[in-house]
Amino acid sequence: YGNDVRTRAKARAAAGSDARMNGCELPVIINSGSGNQGITVSVPVITYAKELKATDEQLYRALALSNLTAIHQRTPIGRLSAYCGAVNAGAAAGAGIAYLSGGDYEAVIHTVVNALAIVSGIICDGAKASCAGKIAFAVEAGILGYNMYMQGQQFYGGDGIVKKGIEDTLKSVGRLGKDGMKGTNEEIIKIMLE
């Protein structure tokens, strides 16, 4: 896959998750109560900050943006859901990367909407090794969401669960995660207990 910053950002986040899911006991930052989400909102942003030679202040702002964006997305979903939290975290990492790359408010919000349009609906079936793959995919969606916007491409209200405006899109995703996945969660538990 190469060694460009995009690949390194995904690989490092996935490696951090893989280590945790396989027993590594080193401490990790959390987001929304999850170490994997903490890794996902932080490691790609840090990787890009180093590549772009960002100042400490730019890095801290990007990390704050990424973390708060993930929390804002997660709030309507609630604490427990079959909706994979890495999806929100990957979109949020894309927001932080957009900021580091010089993106303004419009770039940041369209990055998040684009990323959510790409990967919303991934299920959470417990903490295990495959979380690393989901994280890599979610980070890719975040980066792709930003690149799409920079190329004049975006998803619009009416494209699936995407609504007009960031807040309505987040409400839509929140509804999917909270209400739409109740039955999914029950079925996942049945499958895992077989």
Q: Model-derived features: where do they sit?
A:
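Transmembrane alpha-helix interface/packing and boundary motifs in multi-pass membrane proteins
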Residues: L26-S32, I71-G78
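Functionally critical mobile loop/hinge segments
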Residues: Y1, R8, Y99-E194
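Accessory "access/gating" subregions that flank catalytic or transport cores
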Residues: Y1-N36, G180-E194
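Alpha-helix capping and helix-loop boundary segments enriched in small/acidic/polar residues
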Residues: D4, S32, N36, E57, ...
